[in-house]
Amino acid sequence: MKKLPLLLIALFLSCTLVSAWDVNKKYTGPKTPTTDTTWHPDILSGYEARYVNQGEAFDGPCRSTIIRKLNRKGSRKAFLYVHGFNDYFFQGEMGDRFVDSGFNFYAVDLRRYGRSYEPWQYPFNIRNQEEYFADIDSAIAQIRRDGNTDITLGGHSTGGLTVAFMGAMKGKDVGVDRIVTDSPFLEWNFNSFMRNIAAPTIGYFGKMFPNGKIKQGHCDGYAYSLLKEYYGEWTYNTDWKMVYSPPVTMSWVGAINRAQSKTMKNAKKISVPILVMHSSRKIDGCNYTPVFQTGDAVLDPFMLQKRGEQIIADQQKEQMKRAGKKVEKISNPNILGSQVCAIDSGLHDLILSEKAHRDAAYDTIFSFIRHHLQN
């Protein structure tokens, strides 16, 4: 009987919010794996890209895409960037800044996103967040083949969740030297009921009805704050990074829930320094006003700060235990040099903020990396 209220909530949500239908039903052509995996000029000038076949997935053959721009001075330091939800790598300015700062720059478009999207796929769909590990591992392997010996793994939003999750689940086998996150999706921006009951319930039923779809709000505030044709500074493909986010599947909700939970439960296993960056301000609303240029309109930065501090505290306690020291006598809890940092008036994607604020984000990232390169 104790489970009855939860089941009733689930039934209500399933009936009112979700339309369970086959997300692949519109495509009737062949599902042919990519055959050309050689390097080719990228859509971004000065960059090159190549596809990586990732085998058969629940919806057919899938692929990821590695994008790179190499430092001409022969650097052996690399930065690998993982984009967020409803997103892809288009931030040429970011890659250029890393290259100009002495790094080889890499990015990955994950399966079903951007360059990696195939016509039989539903955009951004996922069953388990672990699926992305193969995409990231392929990029790391390429980075190693290119002769790099020091790798920083970075991620934004759901990409930030994924790289933190990867660090928590793989521990010492994560294959990188440090992790940088930009507004990582460590918690839903919902009220307590939605976070603790509704979202987990939808995720649970997502195992039975993975293709059920949940409509997103018809909000333009964040997209308008980014796009140059409206009020922002940036130009990108709105077929790949849509103004209005498409419905998400129930399986996607479940994958996010599980990744968030497992990341927090296993944070102590993150064996490399981690930087958690977030905005200093939360923006509420749906349609654009100038205030959208002054904070995070997608996630709650104060919740991200709380989750980031919890991750680092668990990580540090584990490191102290391994060092044979008593946790209660920690004088400097940042034994690995992990940090949580607020960027004043940063947008949800901090590196797309107005110049002064994204410069602060870059300064934070480069300072974090330099500190660990010197120690």
Report residues per predicted region.
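Short beta-strand element of the alpha/beta-hydrolase
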Residues: 76-84
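Catalytic nucleophile-loop/oxyanion-hole region of alpha/beta-hydrolase
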Residues: 85-86, 114-150, 356-361
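Conserved alpha/beta-hydrolase
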Residues: 87-90, 95, 99-120
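Alpha/beta-hydrolase-fold enzymes
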Residues: 158, 162-250
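N-terminal cap/lid segment of alpha/beta-hydrolase-fold proteins
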Residues: 23-73
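Bacterial Sec-dependent N-terminal signal peptides
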Residues: 1-22
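Serine-hydrolase catalytic core
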Residues: 214-338
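Catalytic active-site module of serine/aspartate enzymes centered on a nucleophile-bearing elbow/loop
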Residues: 317-375
